[in-house]
Amino acid sequence: MNITVLHGTLSSEPKHRLLPSGDELITYEVTTELADGAASVPVAWLRPSRPPAVATGDAVVVIGHVRRRFFRAASGAASRTEVVASTVLKPDSRRLARLLNTSAETIQRGVVGPAQIPPAA
């Protein structure tokens, strides 16, 4: 199971690109706080459904999965690990609680199996 939830701050402006396929791609750099400092996490969102209006310094929550891409660079073979977003939200979004609950249920089903999950009250 590969589910990622990030909460952090945009460290640069979102970059919008139109791919040759006609699909839109938005990339973000999200800085997350760690116990021993901070980490910058690249995020890619393909065909965004409802991208939030965000700018450098804004807090965001990203729900998605981790992917490692391999490609050729001038120096030879290279790779990049990034989070592929299914959703990017502002932390105050009303949709956030519902999406986090859905993610938690998906994780629980993957860990304990669907037959063992008690029904929601």
Regions found by a protein language model. Name each.
Residues 1-121:
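Single-stranded nucleic acid-binding surfaces, predominantly the OB-fold ssDNA-binding core
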